[in-house]
């Protein structure tokens, strides 16, 4: 029996040791994650307070590693070091635990030396003598462990995000275009200072109209319309960071109303609020017969199946019912979605289920993530995706799948030919050094539009360019050329401008990462380090389309019938040169190089507050309509009223432009568009073929930017 008992005790000891090792390894893995590193703190505390010797010290090292790993990226060291946040967190954990294990090895090795044993015994005596009473010793342990806890809390917890859900402003959203006499739905939301819906809001609202003749902008005083009666909102008794999920029979800060406007023109619904004592404007509503509709969407976001937050069901609900989008694409990273069991199939199923023709359009999409040549969000107009997603991921052994965009084009060729589906590949965050776009891989069949603005910043010009007013995250070194959209246009690429949120926080169409609500305890949760380093508000894309179906929305994107805005605002913009508007090849052909070009821009500004909504201000409608020609500022035209039509005549010759050999980099016998490119080019081929291109950017004094174009002008043969 004694032998059996000894073997049993030995087995138990080994099993217990293995369980401890597995638990410690789980803690080390948790320490690398965003916010959920608190699990590592708990596991570290378990070892620190429940074990002795090396396990006790290991518990403290684990908790300290988790705290330091959080502080690294969240205090900006990822930007200082240039190390990607996830890799920086992993490096900090590895170094911290590695140093502790190295200390253990040294301790074991030196334990054979008498002088070292005497030294450590004396040191313990000095340290423990003041803490000899049990209670005092326990208090000292607690205080010691509070160091990593406090370090972790300092960057991971924001009490205001937890408790401050107080009403701050109202947001009024309506369709951009309706027919005279048609009843339509509009939404009134109350936001807190983090732009989340305030569950506490209980104000009374009343409705009125402010109307203007279209396109002249003269005020309309006799308007036939039916607006809702006064209404008192019912709020929850407690704050919520996701009020739209509450199911308590109350409004919880969000309600839909119905209205009808019979008089043609541009109209703003004004909502007077008893709680804040202010009036708020809706977006402009164009009431006109026989016009194309304007629909709003977000076509580049990420959720829980890759490196974002929120399930597909949550994403589609938020996009449709909270952000009030007309179309939306959840575009998970191809290499990450493959890691989850059946994730791709579930994503396709959820996307197709959320599609409601005439009400809400979902587009299947997937992101090709190649840090060497740039990212492409691939979207499709059908109900299927390629069986092998677009993947480039050497860090998980998938690098050979599609090593360059050339293989991506082959995959899209095969898929569209075999299914009849159409595809677009959308370049984005083109000027961010980590993901810089290499335009030399351009494919005109799939690359027709490019992301001009998102939570990563502005891509119209390189961040150091004098016409780059907003900048970007992680900009390249000063003087870097050839990564902006303007640079691509100067090379002769045919690209139009769209915007998206690139939401990683589970709020498509209205990303909250530019507010303090990026913290990990803001729902929906995530393990990924992808929502704290995006200080810019997410953008939206508007399309001119005949109807709300996948085919019609996709066709509008493919045919460049679109414009973009830098936040949740929804202005009306119409841009023509000699009567030619955006769409198709967006090209005006003139008789001669000296033919005058009459540029007209009709702008109806959105009266909503711009992001971030930290300070209330009544709209003063001050903005500048900028006309950019071939990458230079041709004209700046001020406006100071809600609806304005501005005109400018360009009498300069049609010359075209080029990227220029001087902007290329010569390396090992070949030219490249910049030092980041690995695909040789012929500098003499980087030109517009004699075409001039024009872009309109609206710069509002409140910080909102809107973009439309380009339109190209060429001399007819």
Positions of the model-derived regions?
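Membrane-helix interface and helix-disruption motif detector
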Residues: 13-17, 24-43, 48-58, 72-91
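Membrane-interfacial, low-structure loops and terminal tails that flank and connect transmembrane helices
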Residues: 2-10, 111-136
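C-terminal functional module detector
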Residues: 35-36, 40, 75-93, 100-103, ...
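Internal/C-terminal transmembrane anchor helices
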Residues: 132-157
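Conserved, mostly hydrophobic/aromatic
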Residues: 300, 362, 452, 557, ...
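A metal-dependent hydrolase metal-coordination microenvironment
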Residues: 264-266, 274-275, 279-280, 288-438, ...
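Membrane-interfacial interhelical loops
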Residues: 3, 61-91, 116-125
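Acidic, His- and aromatic-enriched active-site or binding-groove loops in soluble protein domains
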Residues: 353-357, 379-401, 442-460, 517-535, ...
């Amino acid at each position: 029996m004694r032998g059996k008992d000894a073997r049993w005790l030995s087995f138990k000891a080994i099993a217990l040791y293995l369980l401890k090792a597995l638990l410690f390894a789980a803690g080390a893995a948790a320490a690398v994650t965003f916010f959920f590193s608190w699990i590592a703190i708990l596991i570290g505390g378990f070892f620190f307070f429940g074990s002795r010797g090396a396990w006790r010290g290991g518990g403290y090292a684990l908790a300290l590693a988790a705290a330091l790993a959080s502080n690294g990226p969240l205090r900006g060291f990822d930007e200082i070091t240039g190390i990607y946040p996830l890799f920086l967190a992993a490096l900090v954990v590895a170094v911290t635990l590695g140093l502790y294990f190295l200390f253990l090895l040294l301790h074991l090795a030196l334990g054979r030396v008498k002088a070292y044993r005497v030294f450590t015994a004396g040191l313990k005596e000095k340290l423990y003598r003041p803490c000899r009473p049990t209670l005092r010793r326990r208090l000292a342990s607690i205080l010691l462990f509070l160091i990593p806890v406090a370090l972790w809390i300092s960057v991971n917890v924001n009490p205001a995000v937890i408790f401050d859900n107080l009403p701050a402003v109202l947001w009024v959203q309506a369709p951009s275009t309706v027919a005279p006499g048609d009843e339509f739905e509009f939404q009134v939301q109350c936001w807190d200072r983090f732009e989340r819906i305030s569950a506490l809001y209980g104000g009374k609202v009343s409705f009125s109209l402010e109307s203007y003749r279209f396109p002249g902008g003269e005020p309309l005083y006799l308007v036939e319309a039916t607006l809702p009666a006064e209404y008192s909102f019912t709020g929850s008794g407690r704050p919520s960071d996701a009020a739209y999920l509450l199911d308590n029979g109350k409004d919880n800060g969000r309600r839909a109303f119905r209205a009808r406007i019979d008089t043609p023109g541009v109209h703003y619904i004004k909502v007077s609020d008893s709680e804040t004592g202010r009036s708020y404007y809706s977006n402009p509503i164009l009431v006109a017969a026989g016009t194309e509709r304007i629909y709003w969407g977000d076509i580049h976001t990420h959720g829980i199946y890759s490196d974002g937050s929120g399930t597909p069901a949550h994403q589609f609900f938020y996009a449709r019912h909270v952000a009030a989008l007309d179309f939306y694409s959840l575009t998970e990273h191809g290499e990450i979605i493959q890691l989850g069991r059946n994730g791709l199939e579930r994503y396709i199923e959820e996307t197709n289920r959320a599609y409601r023709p005439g009400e809400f359009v979902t587009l299947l999409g997937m992101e090709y993530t190649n840090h060497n040549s740039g990212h492409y969000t691939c979207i499709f107009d059908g109900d299927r995706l390629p069986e092998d997603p677009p993947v480039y991921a050497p860090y998980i052994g998938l690098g050979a799948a599609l090593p360059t965009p050339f293989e991506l084009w082959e995959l899209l060729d095969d898929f569209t030919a075999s299914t009849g589906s159409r595809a677009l590949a959308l370049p984005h965050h083109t000027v961010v050094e980590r993901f810089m776009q290499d335009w030399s891989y351009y494919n005109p069949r799939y690359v027709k539009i490019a992301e001009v603005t998102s939570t990563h910043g502005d891509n119209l010009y390189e961040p150091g360019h004098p016409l780059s007013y907003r900048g970007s995250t992680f900009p390249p070194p000063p003087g870097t050329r050839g990564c902006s959209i303007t640079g691509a246009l100067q090379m002769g690429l045919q690209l139009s401008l769209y915007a998206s949120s690139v939401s990683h926080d589970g709020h498509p169409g209205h990303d909250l990462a530019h507010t303090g609500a990026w913290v990990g305890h803001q729902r929906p949760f995530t393990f990924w380090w992808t929502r704290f380093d995006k200080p810019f508000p997410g953008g939206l894309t508007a399309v001119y389309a005949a109807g709300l179906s996948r085919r019609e929305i996709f066709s509008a994107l493919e045919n460049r019938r679109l414009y973009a805005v830098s936040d949740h605002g929804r202005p009306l913009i119409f841009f023509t040169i000699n009567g030619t508007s955006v769409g198709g090849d967006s090209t005006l052909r003139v008789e001669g190089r000296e033919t005058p070009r009459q540029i007209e821009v009709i702008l109806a500004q959105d009266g909503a507050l711009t992001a971030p909504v930290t300070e209330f201000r009544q709209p003063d409608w001050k903005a500048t309509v900028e006309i950019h020609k071939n990458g230079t500022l041709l004209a700046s035209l001020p406006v100071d009223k809600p609806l304005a039509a501005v005109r400018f005549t360009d009498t300069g010759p049609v010359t075209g432009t080029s990227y220029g050999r001087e902007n290329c980099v010569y390396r090992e016998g070949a030219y490249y568009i910049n030092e980041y490119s690995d695909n040789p080019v012929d500098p003499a081929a980087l030109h517009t073929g004699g075409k001039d291109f024009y872009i309109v950017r609206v710069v509002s004094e409140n910080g909102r930017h809107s973009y439309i174009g380009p339109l190209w002008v060429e001399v007819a043969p």
